[in-house]
């Protein structure tokens, strides 16, 4: 059984690393979050006039 040279192992490692990074970037940039429509649910503030 022939052995792989160290340079071949390194190129294999680089190839798998680049594939993993590409896959992660594609997953990251393909995600589109849904916008939350909260225009109807506005926070009600109570106006308090402080009299010192």
Swiss-Prot record:
Q: Which GO terms describe its biological process?
A: proton motive force-driven ATP synthesis
Q: What does this protein do?
A: Mitochondrial membrane ATP synthase (F(1)F(0) ATP synthase or Complex V) produces ATP from ADP in the presence of a proton gradient across the membrane which is generated by electron transport complexes of the respiratory chain. F-type ATPases consist of two structural domains, F(1) - containing the extramembraneous catalytic core and F(0) - containing the membrane proton channel, linked together by a central stalk and a peripheral stalk. During catalysis, ATP synthesis in the catalytic domain of F(1) is coupled via a rotary mechanism of the central stalk subunits to proton translocation.
Where does the record place it? Mitochondrion membrane
Top-level taxon of the source organism: Eukaryota
Record flagged with keyword Nucleus: no
One GO location term (cellular component): proton-transporting ATP synthase complex
This protein's record includes keyword Mitochondrion: yes
Looking up InterPro entries in the UniProt record yields:
ATP8_metazoa
Q: Name one GO molecular function term.
A: proton transmembrane transporter activity
**How does this chain sit within the bilayer?**
Single-pass membrane protein
Q: Which gene encodes it?
A: MT-ATP8
Protein name, please? ATP synthase protein 8
What the record says about family reads: Belongs to the ATPase protein 8 family.
Q: Subunit composition?
A: F-type ATPases have 2 components, CF(1) - the catalytic core - and CF(0) - the membrane proton channel.
**Spans through the membrane:** 7-23
UniProt keywords (A-Z) are: ATP synthesis, CF(0), Hydrogen ion transport, Ion transport, Membrane, Mitochondrion, Transmembrane, Transmembrane helix, Transport
